[in-house]
Every structure is written in structure tokens, then in C-alpha cells.
């Protein structure tokens, strides 16, 4: 209570008297506080005196965020993020205004960093009592409390990522990553280790917290261990993936492998500033760390990705949903889980690799041999998703050296396309995460691959919707990708379908929950296709016995996907859209009470066909796959049982799931079928023929 009364005693003082008092305190506390704190505050008061005296109070429209894991929180330090359209000069003005208004209330604040190149905002050290004041400042979008991030580490690996037709000791991919620069945000690095000597430039950037505990001894080998090992995995002379890649080191983790979100943000801004001052070729940023979900961390990654930087991060070692952590949950980041030599998920004591829809793929992450900081010729074995992410960063460097013009979306699609598929035992994952987690282990592409005209597609799952009847789930593709089809999935089977709609100038896939349902997922099929032009044609409920029909009526447009949604709770059978391979392949047909949507696209050389596989009686799963040379763009269930849970694409296979038939009382008349729409570019066929 004494503190509160002392603060209030400052409040009625005239401003000149307050300035004198602050200057006096500055002299008295010169030994306790950093130089300039009080002078900075006085300048802020002087510059804002006229403007703030009569400033109106603003309603609190900004939001406050903090880490969901209490032990990782760092109260007292906050990232203040301004609105997207705010001019960069407003960052410093808003910081000064906050300091001045805080001083008028008897609080001291310290501006630790002003962001100019990464995002509009600043980092401030202040009392939590000032949050309400800060949230009301003009231009403020949101404020996030700082939190901790941690290193994620607790030669079969090189053989695993090498294409099967080669052996690790004889295959040397083209250029070895020499055209790419990799930034590593980690601990410090022993740059004179024989594995990485001459390959690593240690920058002067350092933003790390103090080590925990007064007895911690900062041995060089401890401070350098994590970063040195990962640098060796990325570009080591003997054990590295991309042996020709150059690497720059930024220190954001202390000797205990611990850092902060704010320190990492400043590191990312350092990279962005360097990119602006001296543009170079392709950049890969390796973030082998994880913290709790952070809106500002994810936003910073998004901005850097939009600037053309490829970011690769560890999924995390918490045997948990990767979407609960940052930067793993950022859609613009390539998130990597860890597998062992048998292609199984890595277990680390009671924990292990993270999983879920936010993971893009897995890579070797157990017992990885790499450079040790114990001596300049020592090696050590380490495990974790940090090591897995380092492998993918190396593979990305190799791919970008071979094709420097690749965008982030193109690189991600290639990483997925060339991965080893369906090799992970999904039983290791929690049951509700198995369908969401990609069964992919990273691999280098063959040296002779030609992907210029290939149609690449990937499946993107939404977050789970709420359980209310009107709840919806929404998923979107990356900026450079095209949404070619939309489907939905509900574990309870109670859903009201899905549709493609426009949102913010971008097409999204929206799925609808039903009354009594437990929630629904929206599933997008996101593809890369040059010069593509797509539209959605919708037919409202027909009310006729023949059902609702819609087709692609524009010349040159082909059907890439069908979807349907309905307002009534139970249509019985014939819920999903119907596609008939015979007669009219560009037509979708559905229940008479449902709206039917056809996704129709035009691109040079694009051709599509429909494949169907049905069974006379319901089973838990029905699949149909596209042939080699064709790419799955659409996946749906044909009319049949009302017990269908939904349909989704796994690589090039369409999967239709239903509830356990042993408990649903199904009859033999209730048939079900999986329908795939398979597309290809004729340019690819022609190019293949020319090579033969």
C-alpha cells in the first residue's frame, strides 16, 4: 500500500516541480540505474507536455496477449505493436507519449528497442500497472508480454535424406547450397571448429537474458554447444547437409539455451535491416527454438517471409500440438518435427517431438552426429527438433542454390513433394492428431528432377471449430497458392458441409458444424499452377428429386473440386456432392436440399479427370488415388451412408472416413465411395517426352 500512496503523491505536482524532482532522483540513483533513464524521461515529458495536457482518453480497442505457460512469462517487459498502416515515425512518438503519460502518473519506463524494419512498434520495460494506459494509446494494435524461448535439443541422418538411388558417400547435389546464406539464431558458436571453420561468420549481434542462478559457470563449451552443433548439421565439412552454404550466427540464446521473444524479434529485425542495406541472394533463417504461442513472434515471421526470406523452425520437444508454440504455429514458417533412424517420431524421455497440423514435415532428429564445442576436432551426438530443423534448412539451401528464383510457397511444395511418404507409425501420435499430422520425412530431390511445369498440391487443415451449431472453421492457402478444392471432416459426423468463399480478397474454405456436433475441420487443397484463373459456380437447393446440379460453363475451364453445404440438420443419405466420371465430367450433383459449389479453373495445358472407387457396404475408410503423372486436386464422398465423417486428401490419395460400422447399425444398402479429381499439365507431359 505504501507504494500506491507514494505514486499518488506525485500526481498533483506542477510539471516544472516534477521535472526538478526527477532530476534530483536521477542524481541520487546514479549508481543504481543505467545512465540516461531519467534524462530520457525528462525529454519525453518536455516534448509531450503541450500535446498531452488536454489529450482526450481513447477507448481501449487494443488487445493484450501473454504466454499461456506461466513459468515462461516475463512480466515487466512488453512488445507494443502498432497498427499495420501506421507510419514508422509513429513508433518513437508513441513510445515517448507512453513515457510521458506514465511519468505524469509517477511511473518510470525504459524504451529498450524501437522497431523500424520488421514491424511498427517498440519494446518497453514498465510496470504492469501501465498496461491499461498503454492499450488506450492511439495507433496501438496490441501489446504482448515478453516470454522465454528455448533451444530444442536434448550418420544415418545423411543417408536418410539422400534419394534412394544414391548413397551418402557418392551423391553430391549440385552447388551444395553455395548460392544461399543461412542465418542461425542460437547460442554462440565455436567458429574455429574444423567442421565449420571458414564457413561461419559470427556477427556482433547479441540479445540474451542473464543465466538463471548465481552459481552458473559460463564455460565456453556450454555457451557454444547448441549453436556449434547445428551449424555443423547445416553446412559442416563432413557431417553437414549443405556443405557449400555460408552461415551467419546471431546470438539470441544464453549459455543455458534460453532466450526471449523480444530478443529474437530484435534479431529478426537485424536480418531484415541487413537485407535492405545489402541485398543478396536467397536467405534461409533457422530458428531452432520454441516458446509459447506468441502473436507478435508469428507476425514478425510473416513480415520477414513476405520479404522473400525462408524461415525454418523446430516444431518443439514437448510431445504436444505444435500449434500451441511459436514460431512453430506461424503459417509462413516451415515447421519441422523429428524422427529417428527407423523413421519413427523421436521420444525424449517422457516428452518427444511435437506434432499436428502446424507441422509441415519431419526430418532426422535423434542421435545426430555433429560438431562439438568441447574442442576444435570433437564431435557429439544430439537429439531434438532443432536438429531436424537444421536438416531441412540445409535441404532448403540446396534447393535454392539449384533454383534461386523459388518462392517460399514453391520451396515448401517441393519439400513436401520429394519427402518420403507414409513411413511414420502414426500410432505414436494421440488419436485425435493422427489425421492432422503429415506422414512425411524430408529428403533431397533427385539431381535430374524438372519441376517447372509440375502441378504441386498440399493439404492444409484448419483449426478445430467450436461445438455450437453455427460454429465454422476457416482455412486459407499461402499467398502464392491457389485454392482448388474444399472439403470438411467431423469426428462426430455431424456437419453441414463446406464451401469456398471470398474473404479479404482471397478465397477461403469454410466448413460448418451441425447441431449436436463436436466441431468440424475445413480442409483446403492448395496448389501451385502458373497463370491459373479460378472461379466458383454455385447452384442453390433445387428441391427436385433429381438433386442439385452445377457445372463449369466457361470455355476452357475444368472442374478441380466440388463442395456442398446445407442448412437443415439431417439430410439422411446423399449429403455430399456427386461427381460422375461418365457423361458430364465437369458437373457436380448433390442433394436437392443442399447448395452445390463447383471450383472451375483455367490454366495453360490444364486437364482434369474424375476417378471413383465405391463399395457396396460401408467401411471405416475408402480410398482412391491418382495415377503417376496426375495430381489430386479434389476429394469428396459420393452419396451413401449418413455416417460419413468427411473426406480429405493425403498426398495423392483421396480418403473418405465413416464411423465405426460395428456400432452404427448400418445396412448393406448403404454404399459409399471416394471420388478424386486428378489434374495435370500437358506441358509436363510434353517436357517428359522431349527428355526421352
Swiss-Prot record:
Listed name of the protein: Proprotein convertase subtilisin/kexin type 9
Protein family (similarity comment): Belongs to the peptidase S8 family.
InterPro entries: PCSK9_C1 (IPR041254), PCSK9_C2 (IPR041052), PCSK9_C3 (IPR041051), PCSK9_ProteinaseK-like (IPR034193), Peptidase_S8/S53_dom (IPR000209), Peptidase_S8/S53_dom_sf (IPR036852), Peptidase_S8_subtilisin-like (IPR050131), Peptidase_S8_subtilisin-rel (IPR015500)
Protein's organism: Colobus guereza
Taxonomic superkingdom: Eukaryota
Subcellular location(s) of the protein: Cytoplasm; Secreted; Endosome; Lysosome
Inhibitor I9 domain: residues covered: 77-149
EC number: 3.4.21.-
Gene name for this UniProt entry: PCSK9
Propeptide span(s): 31-152
Coiled-coil boundaries: none
